[in-house]
Amino acid sequence: MEDKIKSFLDLVRERNGDEPEFMQAVEEVAETVIPYIVNKNIYHGKNILLRMVEPERVISFRVCWVDDSGEIQVNRGYRIQMNSAIGPYKGGLRFHPTVNMSILKFLAFEQVFKNSLTTLPMGGGKGGSDFDPKGKSDNEIMRFCHGFMSELFRHIGPNTDVPAGDIGVGGREIGFLFGKYKKLKNEFTGVLTGKGISWGGSLIRPEATGYGTVYFAQNMLATKKDDFKNKIIVISGSGNVAQYAAEKSIQLGAKVVTMSDSSGYIYDPEGIDSEKLKFIMNLKNIERKRVSEYCVKYPNSIFVKDETPWSIKCDIALPCATQNELNINDAKTLLENGCICVSEGANMPSTKDAVHEFQKAQILFAPGKASNAGGVATSGLEMTQNSLRYNWTRKEVDEKLKDIMMEIHNSCIEYGSDNNGYVDYVKGANIAGFVKVADAMLAQGVV
């Protein structure tokens, strides 16, 4: 079996060159899915996984825009249309200087499995640019977004490819992108998700990824007859996902003690309550300042520069910042400090070695493709509402989100349980996501 996995990975590596993030994502899937394929005659000779790791389409383009000083700037734009076997391509746009082909291919590949797990008819894709929105004026961001959409518009559509937000792309950017698309196409359609409520958005969409991460952890804890009440929670990040993961944790009676950004983390031993969280939301969403400002307002807290929060003692860890933020040493520290549950809010925030450490200890560990699928699930619900020209209530969307996260959890248990009662959620998520897409690809022939 190891030889089969190695030969497959060698072939993918040879085809894709130096793309470490993409290879990390493929390796994780191959380790669990190839043994499953070997035992299922229906997939023999079809090269299904090899077809899944090859994008259906890779789009790269130039984005020119004018900054506030009148100088022309040039960035690169991308869209990876990975797999459309079960629905139109669906996945976010990321604006960040680190964006490259490897990162977007990894995100698009993960998105295929994540979208499959939601039970909704969505394929997988991802896109973005190496543009850095930090320090830019609203007008500069608008001009960049309009330049970006001037090329992207010809490759997307409500039945073809429906982008959304990601790191560096929030409600403001989605608004600029949608406005330009509407102008270019002269039509009002659900071509983007994450829109404002008054122009086609869905209630709960901003909260969905963070809420879903917590709902998934709730489902895992329930298998041990446990819950969030009085648990100590360590959260990384302070963006959208982290904010709403914190909000839902607080609502469930837990004590959130950390949040972070790229400058370091804050630790509040008294706990970040609802009032303090509102301060952080205003700090990050409106004032766009560093999380360290929290310690000026609340002097009983401390700020640790250039570090991640995984050394803080906790019951539950929710990594909600970015890929590979939690390494094997962090995993060992969390385990030594008594952590019983890790639910990934970001995409692939734990390194491969860290994941193996959690699995070896047999704690509750949820991979991002399962636990943070609430965001894209609610994007799917937004697409449904756009098609119906109708809006569900906040309660209706939240209930649907809870149901979807429970279904994802049940699928992970179905494919990830061993004979001793341990649930390998990584294995379960990979196989459950694979089966739906693979069966659709078989049914549609060689295309």
Each language-model region and where it sits:
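N-terminal ligand-binding/catalytic initiation module
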Residues: 1-203, 436-445
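Adenosine-phosphate binding glycine-rich loop
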Residues: 2-25, 220-221, 335-447
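Structural motif
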Residues: 78-79, 121, 128, 160-161, ...
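General beta-strand structural signal in soluble alpha/beta enzymes
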Residues: 106, 160-164, 187-192, 235, ...
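Rossmann-like adenosine-cofactor binding region
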Residues: 264-365, 370
